[in-house]
């Protein structure tokens, strides 16, 4: 969380100088769905979402587009460790998620702290 805060503060002025810049942050549905044994992860994602939304509100009068993306269930090492035995064939691959994120980035839409669910894109 602190690294994201420092990144925002370091890049804020530069992003504002650009004609049309975008900032994208990866979150998780865990930010709003409390689950047992996921406390630190869920808290960090909830705090990230809140911090990014505050930053978006601070930039509501310029062209800086600020997005939060929930990639959804993705076949990663973290997920395999957390969910052993889960059928990976029903999960998105990281490459599929990345392609959707790239498409989202290139939409001609200014976002002000919206949360985009990759599974719905």
Region locations from a protein language model:
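Structured catalytic cores of enzymes that bind and process phosphorylated ligands/cofactors
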Residues: 4, 20, 46, 78, ...
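Catalytic loop of short-chain dehydrogenase/reductase
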Residues: 6, 12-60, 73
